[in-house]
């Protein structure tokens, strides 16, 4: 079978997102964030290749990055592919800490932990979906992730508002709103119900 050429799909929203980050963050933090994102995605790619899944491309949009690939076969491979990104981020944390770059290390760890939240289309949600589907069936997994996809973003937004009222910034609330936008039926969907491709968000 002929292999497909890797495709990079950059949406207009991605350009706006990158421009916003450039103007809102100091250049050094943009570089640190870019390093964390690249290492995270390379972790996914390495695991997918080792699991025998073909990677078709990378899509950049207003809600972040989505790695497009053939769905890995079996729960174990799906879990491994999902957790490989955060694992790579944790490895980068250790390396940067050892080299004396604590800011970049902490950002990489924060990025990895955020992706482990049990909500689709994040890595933690994909891993949880595979586990529940293997133990209780795909329908039970879908119902659980639907509930988490509603409850968790709302909880994060509520907590973010409470923290903002205490003068601690809006970051958590914005993150919760971003997660809400990634849920099916919203503006930025994570490809949850796509049967042809699997997407690894961020």
List where the protein language model places each region.
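Hydrophobic transmembrane alpha-helices and their immediate loop junctions
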Residues: 1-202
